[in-house]
Regions:
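Active-site donor-binding acidic/aromatic loop of nucleotide-activated sugar
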Residues: 42-47, 59-69, 75, 125-126
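Short acidic alpha-helix that forms the nucleotide-activated donor recognition element
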Residues: 65-79, 101, 119
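A short, well-ordered alpha-helix in the C-terminal region of glycosyltransferases
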Residues: 141, 149-164
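Conserved donor-binding/catalytic core segment of Leloir-type glycosyltransferases
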Residues: 1-11, 17-20, 35
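Glycosyltransferase donor-sugar binding loop
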Residues: 4, 33-48
C-alpha cells in the first residue's frame, strides 16, 4: 500500500498510519506492507511524530518511510494499492491521476481534485476525509476483490486518465 506525497499534516500520513494499525490488528486480511513516500522538506518535527506513532503501534516492520524516488512509475509499479489521504482539498490531486494512469487502484479522500478525477467505484474509491475507519473499510474492500476485478479497476482508471488528459485536451 503506497502513500506518496510530501510529509505535511494535511497530506494525511497520520490517518494513514492509524489505518495501517487498524488493518494490522485484523486477522481476516492477507499480510501487507505500507510505504510512505515523500520528503519532510525540513519538517523533521512532523516526521519524528509520525515515526513515534509507527513505533507506538509497533508497525516498524510494516510501514517503511522513503524520502524520495526519482522514478515514480517504479514506485507505483510495486504498489497493489495507492492511497491519497489529504485532509484539505487539493486543486488537482496528482496522486489520484498518477495511480490511475499506472493502472493501480486508488483510494482517496472525498475532497478536492480526486473527486473529479476518480469515477467512484469504477476507477477508484473515495472515503470520508479524516476518517480512519472509512479508509480502513475502503482498503479492506479493495483487498477482498479478486485479481480480475482489480485489473479491471486499474484498466478503467488508465482509460479514464488517457481520455481526460490527452495532449489535445491539455494543450489546445
Amino acid at each position: 500500500i503506497l502513500l506518496p506525497g510530501r510529509l505535511t499534516h494535511w497530506k494525511g500520513q497520520k490517518i494513514f498510519i492509524e489505518t495501517i494499525n487498524l488493518l494490522y490488528e485484523r486477522k481476516d486480511i492477507p499480510p501487507f506492507e505500507a510505504i510512505i513516500l515523500g520528503s519532510d522538506q525540513g519538517r523533521n518535527v512532523y516526521k519524528k511524530r509520525l515515526l513515534g506513532l509507527v513505533q507506538q503501534y509497533r508497525l516498524n516492520r510494516i510501514i517503511k518511510f522513503i524520502d524520495r524516488c526519482e522514478e515514480m512509475p517504479v514506485a507505483y509499479g510495486i504498489a497493489n494499492l495507492v492511497c491519497s489521504c489529504s485532509s484539505e482539498p487539493e486543486a488537482f490531486g496528482r496522486v489520484s491521476v498518477e495511480a490511475q494512469s499506472m493502472g493501480i487502484p486508488i483510494v482517496a479522500s472525498d475532497i478536492g481534485g480526486s473527486t473529479e478525477t476518480i469515477v467512484k467505484d469504477k476507477t477508484g474509491f473515495l472515503f470520508k476525509s479524516g476518517d480512519s475507519n472509512a479508509l480502513t473499510n475502503a482498503i479492506i474492500m479493495v483487498m477482498q476483490k479478486d485479481y480480475n476485478s482489480l485489473k479491471s479497476i486499474g484498466s478503467e482508471g488508465r482509460k479514464n486518465i488517457l481520455k481526460k488528459f490527452d495532449v489535445d485536451k491539455m494543450c489546445h
